[in-house]
């Protein structure tokens, strides 16, 4: 096979992979998967302690990221302690953060966590897979003075 033909086949193969990648990215995470991931994170934090667990939760290559599902840990004052979707949020007070509809979703989340041991919350957020703003449901469990959360995208 000539170098030119080989290059053409390689380019076609690369194009096919690019076209197939979104479809092969697998489906979005489910509610059951979100609950299981949050419970796994809570157990990991209890077992390993925050100093070891939070960096693992925030790691892009860690065990707490699966497709569009990742874990976020908030202090009950709104400060992010760990964030699997964007480590730049760690250490920041996010309680004034609004979604595209103007909802103060972090403030609402920490208020819910102060009242309930676990809950689901609806808001809109950028999907890490396709970067589009989508309806999202976040499942959270209170752990001492924190909320450990993992969410699913509904589209």
Describe the function of each predicted region.
Residues 2-155:
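N-terminal membrane-sensor/transducer module of prokaryotic signaling receptors
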């Amino acid at each position: 096979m000539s170098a030119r033909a080989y290059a053409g086949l390689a380019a076609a193969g690369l194009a096919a992979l690019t076209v197939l990648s979104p479809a092969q990215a697998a489906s979005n995470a489910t509610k059951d998967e979100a609950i299981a991931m949050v419970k796994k994170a809570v157990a990991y934090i209890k077992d390993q302690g925050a100093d070891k667990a939070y960096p693992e939760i925030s790691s892009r290559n860690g065990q707490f990221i699966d497709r569009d599902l990742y874990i976020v840990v908030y202090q009950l004052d709104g400060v992010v302690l760990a964030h699997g979707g964007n480590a730049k949020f760690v250490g920041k007070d996010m309680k004034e953060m609004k979604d595209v509809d103007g909802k103060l979703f972090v403030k609402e989340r920490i208020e819910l966590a102060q009242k309930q041991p676990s809950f689901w919350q609806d808001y809109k957020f950028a999907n890490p897979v396709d970067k589009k703003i989508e309806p999202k449901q976040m499942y959270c469990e209170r752990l001492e003075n924190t909320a450990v959360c993992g969410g699913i995208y509904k589209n």
